[in-house]
Amino acid sequence: MQARTMQTWIARRMAIRQRLERVCTSYLLFLMVVTKKHSLEQAARFSGLHKSQFCKMLQSHSKVAISTVESLSKKQAKQFSQPLQNLKGLPWKMAIVVDSTLQRRASLHPENAKKFNHGKGYVIGHQWTNIVLIINDMLIPLRPIPYYSKPYCLAQALPYQTAHELVVDYLSNLHLEDYIGSYDPRDVIVLADSGYDDKKIENAIANKHWNFIISVGKTRSVKSEALYLTTPTSRAWCHIAAFFRNHRRLKWTTIRVMTNGAKRKRMEFRIRHTMGYLRYVGKVQLVCSEPKKRPDGRRKYLACNDASATARQIVVGYRLRWTVELFHKDIKQHLGFEDVATSGFDSVMSHVHWVYCAYILLYMSPPGVPPEVKGIGDKQRKVQQCLGHKEKRRILQKLSQIGGVERYKDELRQALADA
């Protein structure tokens, strides 16, 4: 199959001006194949275009990349949402997962680069908050949220917002009708870890009549139903860790969950749960969960505002959040999420959004890729096999041109120098 066939297939799924069509489709096709590093030099060598064309496209047309991600995610959601099926063993039909990832940079010199605490140290780079939609076992990335540092906001005359404020604005303005059509808000569950345990986020979700399962910090204030009815609103709150320690009458229950891996292992959790109140939010189900064969350091406290859900459904539903971690692994390992060397943040933003476009396109059944191919790496290898003869045709065309032999020798020398 010729590369032009694949580029035509890509162009038909996007609304891009004809002037930018070739460079955008060439960059997307480059991201959709296997390569050691997704650099502009490699993109130019792969497509036959000049490096400056990709550089100008990334620097000057970030809005095109953003709008393309939004249109592709809506098309994919409409394609896979009919009919909507319940999530595995759960009462909800769709899940929205909120999680952040860090894009590493070598230094603080690029625009909007910042030090972020991560694990036992720090990471220099950019932070992206990802919002992904899970429907019918399909993960669909929505437009990511970039974090703007205070110096960058000052230089660009932008109002500074924290990461939590950005998430609140995003969820408040997210209209799922544009993605899946009419739906019942009670079928939506929002999943987030303790990094997004914020009353404003939880109230924004509740105001949209959605459900949430959020891992709360051990110092989050809660109150039992009995105390809520008999004490003033401002008193008798205690940390959730102390709450479960003081309510030892709540018995431990063991649940068994099958993993989603190839080996299908069984995990055992022991849980305690009760109804209570989350301060500044309202009535929720409180769950204390920990692996049965691990120490207390792995203990999690979950809050769910769906009163009809069982404790087992809450624990199993929260485990769906792991799919976004696998998504982060795929875009970093296969699609070159961190392979960016530009100093301007507009170029970084364009590259990230084109990476998301490539991820969506690989799951939209490109020509030559059979549906039984599931992994993102396998899909890339299949696309590369379909384009296998493209490099031979490019070399023969270059050698037949005037001065083509010398230009091809220079290209080989450059490739050997980069290796």
Predicted features and spans:
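Gly/serine-rich nucleotide phosphate-binding loop at the start of the catalytic core
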Residues: 1-68
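Short amphipathic alpha-helical "interface-anchor" segments enriched in bulky aromatics
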Residues: 102, 230, 241, 245, ...
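Short, conserved catalytic/metal-binding motifs centered on acidic residues
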Residues: 43, 92-106, 131, 187-197, ...
